[in-house]
Structure formats: structure tokens, C-alpha cells
Amino acid sequence: MFVATALALGAAVLHTAWNLRVKQSGDRWLALWGLFAAGGIIGLPYAVVATVSGDLGWSAWGWATASGAVHAFYIGRLARTYEVADFSVTYPIARGGGAMFAAIGGVLFLSDRLSTLSMIGILIVVSGLTLLAGHVDWNHVGPALVVGLLIGTYTVIDSKGSRSTVGSAYAMAIFVTGGVGTTIQGLARRRWSEMRASVPVMWKQYASTGLASLVTYWMVLLAVRRAPVGYVTALRESSVVLASFIGWRILKEGSGVRRIVASTTMVVGLVTLVVGR
């Protein structure tokens, strides 16, 4: 259990860290593009081997491609939201809202069933979101909710895709298609010259954040093999509380105590949602 605890908490810290790095970047979209491009390059050999061995079929690649397209929109919206909204607002709402939207999407599109306890969990999450949004400009809350909706959308797609493959190969495919999708988005936005020019200067950040994102996934995967999913989720989603604390103490954002209480409420709701499934 100690190993699972360390892995889950480590994943929470890593996920918060790379999001904070993006928030503090001068060009948030470029930072996110570099993250996914680097993650795709790192994950490509694994995905190729899994495809050749048959562990990663064409059906899974189809779902991964759809997920990559949604990720491209997600990256664009997340970058824009980090430009206009506080870190301690965007991150908790996006993460909490994403899990809530994913649960609802699972019922609508994957024939999942929610128990009474899970529905109570959703209500608790909504309460936390309401508390967090209560004294925040809607121009900040709205974009964060859109990010959460996109997270919920690609989570539902990935849930379907992961059921059609073996092991963690699908996660590598997501990074590959996400990197391709984001690159195509950059080309469509006529940012190729900026993307190319940023690589010699920013490649260390791109590689470190891309690797951190991949390692985050692996740590959660290893943790759930050693401990109950609900326990791991509780520790993993503690990242929303950590983000609120960082926003308050490091980034000097306002309403720190209120945002920490709201984020903690969302964690309780998310854990209740998972345990009730």
C-alpha cells in the first residue's frame, strides 16, 4: 500500500507541476503543443511495437484518432483559459468538471450505470464547483467548464478505445495522435514558423513536460494494480487541492481558503463517484 500511495501522490504532484509550468509559460499554446509533440515522439516506438504485435488494433487507433482530434481542441481551450483565468480556478474546475462530464457521458454513450452513491458524488462535485465559482467572474468559470467538457469527451472516447486494446498501448497511441492533431492545428493557425523556432530554445521544457505527462499515466496505472481504485483516485485527485494551494501561496491569487475548501469538496465528490461505481 505504501508503494501505491507514493505512486498516486507522485502522479498528482507531476500533473499539477506540468500544468503550472504551462500556466507560467509566455506562450501557453506553444508549451502545450511541445508537451504533446514530445510525448508523441517518446510514445511512438511503443505504439509501433504494440501495433505490429497486434496488441494495438486498428479499431483502437480509430478511437485514438478521435481522441487526438478532441485533444487538439482541448489544448487550444486550455491555453486560452490559462491566459484569462487563475490557476486555482481553471485547474480544479477543469479536473472536477471533466470527471463529472465523463461519468454522465459514460451513462449516455457507453451504457454505464451510476449507483445512488455515484449520483451523490456528482452532486457533491457540483457543490464544490458552485462554491468555487460563487465569487469568480463567469468569464473565468465558463472557459474552465468548456475545458472540463472536453476532458469529459476525450475520457469517454478513451474509455471505449482502451477496452479494445491490451495493456497501456492505447495511452501511447493517444499521445501520438494528440501530438499530430495539435501540430495540424498549429499549421492551420499559421504558427509553423513559431513552432519550429521554439524547438531549439524550448526542447528541454517540451521533453520534460511530455515525459512527465507520460510518467503520470504510468504511475496511476501501477498504483491501481496495487490498491483499490477508489483509494488511488482519492490521492490522484488531491491535485486539485494542491493546485488551489499553489495558486494561493505561490501565484498570489485571491480567495485562497475558499478555493481550497471548494477543491477539497470536489475531491470528496470524485472519490464518492468512483467508489460508488
Locations of regions flagged by a protein language model:
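Functionally critical, cavity-lining and gating residues within the transmembrane helices
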Residues: 74-75, 102, 154-155, 213-217, ...
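Specific alpha-helical transmembrane segments that line the substrate/conduction pathway
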Residues: 66-71, 80-126, 171-179, 229-249
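C-terminal appended segment following the main domain
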Residues: 219-277
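Membrane-interface interhelical linkers
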Residues: 1-69, 73-87, 134-145, 176-226, ...
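Selected transmembrane alpha-helices and immediately adjacent juxtamembrane segments
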Residues: 139-172
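Hydrophobic transmembrane alpha-helices of multi-pass small-molecule transport proteins
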Residues: 37-43, 100-107, 114-133, 258-277
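Short hydrophobic alpha-helical membrane-embedded segments
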Residues: 10, 33-41, 93-101, 119-120, ...
